[in-house]
Amino acid sequence: MSADQPRKTPLRGRLPLFLCLAFVSLLTTLDARAAEILLTGAQDTPGVQSFTQALQARRPQDNVRFAPLASLPSPDRLPGDVRLVLLDPPSLDWRLQKNHGPATLVLRISRLQAYERLGEATPERLSLLWSDPPMARQLQLIRRVLPQVRRVGVLFDRHSEFLLKDIQQAARPLGLEIVSERWDDSSDNRPLQNLLGRSDVLLGLDDPDLYNPKTVKNLLLSSYARQRALIGPSAAFVRAGSLASTYSDQDDWLAILDELLDRPTASWPRTLYPVRFKVMSNQQVARSLGIEPIDAEAVAAQLAEGEHRP
């Protein structure tokens, strides 16, 4: 080798330096992209802990944590880049104290809970993720499992009356007639009996004044005495004795939340029904009403396909 030939730095010496720099760059990039996701609610229950841990497992690149509502400052004192997830009505009441604050996802809030607090308005930087199954989906479920029915009975009270317009709009393209009856006093059975006499099936609303543990027995016995099925209002009611309902479980909500958190907060919807869902049916009730067995998975797939079709 010539004495004046330049010496080359051995590759073996340069490689560790290159890998070190690349690793530091990767860590810096990941740290810059990590989001601060704050879940809050009035109580730190085992269910809340399980949900938080499941979201942490889905988003290991982010800082996902739960903080009890009582430990937080007012919303306008939180960092603006925090992504806030509210888990219950008390946390929504806290968020509504201030107009300013971080972008907020209100998880699993019912239409009634929102209407009582907001009316028809949706404040800026709030995204309301409805816990109710959309009425259009529930009516499609009726068409799938009870294709012969035409008159759909709906009980309502002063709290849920505002939902009737949406139900009627959803029923019209399906050729279904909505027959409604006001039921302000659940101890008076006459409105229920009157409605059952004028309808082919009963569609339950997510209205706890009408559908609750105290009214469930009367609702179900009265309906089935007239050979009328009850659809909805929830999976819990199906377990109690209604025929069927669409619903979204924790896995569905985790997937929905995960998808939203991947998006810029400016693109979050103002309101959103759960796009992922399942169907639950009560086969014993189906048999007692002389209804063909319901394949819940197949019906859910058919409903989802219909919603995604242009």
Specify the residue positions occupied by each region the protein language model found.
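Polar low-complexity intrinsically disordered regions enriched in Ser/Thr and small residues
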Residues: 7, 15-16, 50
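Short hydrophobic alpha-helices and adjacent helix-cap/hinge residues
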Residues: 34-310
